[in-house]
């Protein structure tokens, strides 16, 4: 079930403060965060976030199309290396 409209989108306070400070100073430094649960709001457009995926920080540049999604959606936590091809030698026995 989606979040109630009267509550508004969830954004961690420390993340919002860092974006506001950068907007005041007109700087665009990478903001390192572990907050994958934060919703992307219009204030984030044009900023780059380094979102933690469990072992490293993945750079995510926020665009208009990302507004309303969560930061964690753009930093995958699992790596898919493909299915193993059948071993033909084992089948001949």
Swiss-Prot record:
An example Gene Ontology CC term for this record: cytoplasm
List this protein's GO terms for biological process. ribosomal small subunit assembly; translation
List, alphabetically, the Gene3D superfamilies matched. 30s Ribosomal Protein S19, Chain A (3.30.860.10)
Mind telling me which Pfam families this protein's record contains? Ribosomal_S19
Q: Which GO terms describe its molecular function?
A: rRNA binding; structural constituent of ribosome
Q: Which UniProt keywords apply?
A: Ribonucleoprotein, Ribosomal protein, RNA-binding, rRNA-binding
Instruction: Write out the similarity annotation.
Output: Belongs to the universal ribosomal protein uS19 family.
Question: What is the annotated role of this protein in its UniProt record?
Answer: Protein S19 forms a complex with S13 that binds strongly to the 16S ribosomal RNA.
What's the protein name?
Small ribosomal subunit protein uS19
- Gene designation: rpsS
């Amino acid at each position: 079930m989606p979040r109630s409209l009267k509550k508004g989108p969830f954004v961690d306070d420390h993340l919002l403060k860092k974006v506001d400070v950068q907007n005041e100073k007109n700087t665009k430094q990478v903001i390192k965060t572990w907050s994958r649960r934060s919703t992307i709001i219009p204030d984030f457009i044009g900023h780059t976030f380094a979102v933690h995926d469990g072992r490293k920080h993945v750079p995510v540049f926020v665009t208009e199309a990302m507004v309303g999604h969560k930061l964690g959606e753009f930093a995958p936590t699992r790596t898919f290396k493909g299915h193993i091809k059948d071993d033909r030698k084992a089948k001949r026995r």
